Amino acid sequence: MNTQIEEFDMNENLEILQIIEEWKLDFHLGNAVKHILISGKKETEDEELEDLKSASWYLTRKIQVLNDETCNWENVKDLTKTTFIIPVCVESKDRYNNAVSVLGFLNKNFKTNVIIHELTKDDSKLDFISSLKNLKINHIVEVNSLDYYHRTRQLNEMLNIVKTPVVVNYDIDVILPVGSYIESQKLILEGTSDFVYPYGDGEFQREISLFFNRNDFNINFDLQSIENKLLKTLRSKYGHCIFANTKKYIKCGGENENFIGYGPEDQERENRFITLKYNVSRVDNLVYHFEHSRTKFSNGDSEYYEPNNKLFDKLSAMDYKSMSDYYDNVEYKQKYDKFN
């Protein structure tokens, strides 16, 4: 489609919405035009630059949508036996940007199932997911006061409605090399593993700087487009994401909802799987984490932080029998039909 944009005389006082309607512009092009037009009316160069950056972002998203619509299906991998369960709370611009990049990456590379549980004070912030055509998305929006972040509950509510044999507890800020997704699903389906960490234990994490060129990445979703100097090497062991046999994940209690907010639930989860004698394995490859600003939802500044640590210490001291008894009788399971 070769559409040439005319130049507008701002003195003619044309209403922006009128322009968008007359040109029959879609969501992304409409917003790009809006920001371009209003940028010329700003009093300072900084204000003008912000609008031009916004226009650039919407144009990049439009390019991505067109890429997705014309993508080579031979390059889209089949993960239809897997469901990604992704808890989301868009409490910052960084988190929104990461959601665009991560979900766009999954959409570019896989045909798969995704359940998103979004906590929000009002309307959904994920205004782009309808363009992700390769993902079969179930988007749950929960209006919440956001006094605290109960991520473990979000995950269990999604886990309870998963219909595929493989499920992935997935962080909205991470991506993996494409082969790691394929190998992890294979290990679960073949019965070799009950749970798979799709990254190595050690210096396998690459933290992506806030200052990397996101517009370039969001066009082709190519990990090679991220400059090495903007990748920081960190250790990885827990968190990020984990592939699981759906039935066994449910059988051993899913997520422990007594952990509220930021805490050691990632460590507890691995310790539980090992104590209860499940087969846990790893794919020794990298995990890429998009950095984001830290809020009360992603640091230890919470009234629940100390109780979370005490619960972790209690559970870590349990043997097979005491842990089995605990998770067989834990109260939160009563809410979910598949957990009983």
Across the structure, where does each feature detected by a protein language model lie?
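Conserved catalytic core of nucleotide-sugar-dependent glycosyltransferases
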Residues: 177-257
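N-proximal low-complexity "stem/linker" segments adjacent to membrane-targeting elements
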Residues: 72-105
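Intrinsically disordered, low-complexity regulatory regions
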Residues: 1-73
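Acidic donor-binding segment of Leloir-type glycosyltransferases
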Residues: 103-143
